[in-house]
Amino acid sequence: GKNILAENLAYIFNRPAYNVSFHVNTNSGDLIGTDTFVDNEVKLRKGTIYQCAEYGGFGILDEINMAKNDAVSVLHATLDYRRSIDVPGYDKIDLHPAARFIGTMNYGYAGTKELNEALVSRFLVIDMPAQTEESLEFIFRRMFPNIKENARTQFIGVFLDLQLKATNSEISTKPLDLRGLLAAMKIVE
């Protein structure tokens, strides 16, 4: 849901989308770029953040709370008033005026951590609300118009019960996966 929203924003603003999926091995070179050989010469292979900055796209920083400090340090100057990237061994580049960055994250997943205040302050935080019975009803009616009322009510009830237990830390957030539930229902349909 979060990444689809980010990609749709890029589409609405008619800007290219550059996706970065953070994981424990993502480093600053992956974001800015690394040296490579082209025709027996060392050239910069531009990273995702570099390309986004250069062409004015939407940088979608997926699971930003899994990023190592090395990777996050690249984002500080990029996201603050300087709006620039220092490319070691090359030049400093200024961000295209249309360049935007959207960080997405899930709380409580393995390998995630709290974001530091300096990074969070560079974003406008949008907390995606939990699903309500009404929103689930809308989704299920659109995706499964032929499902029996009783079955739809039960599926919604199971999801809401799991969501409540996850919110109260009675269970992990892992079982709470609307995408997975919808995929399972498509198989049964």
Go through each PLM region and give its residues.
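AAA+ P-loop NTPase catalytic core and its hallmark functional loops
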Residues: G1-N168
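C-terminal helical "lid" subdomain and adjoining coupling/linker elements of P-loop NTPases
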Residues: K165-E189
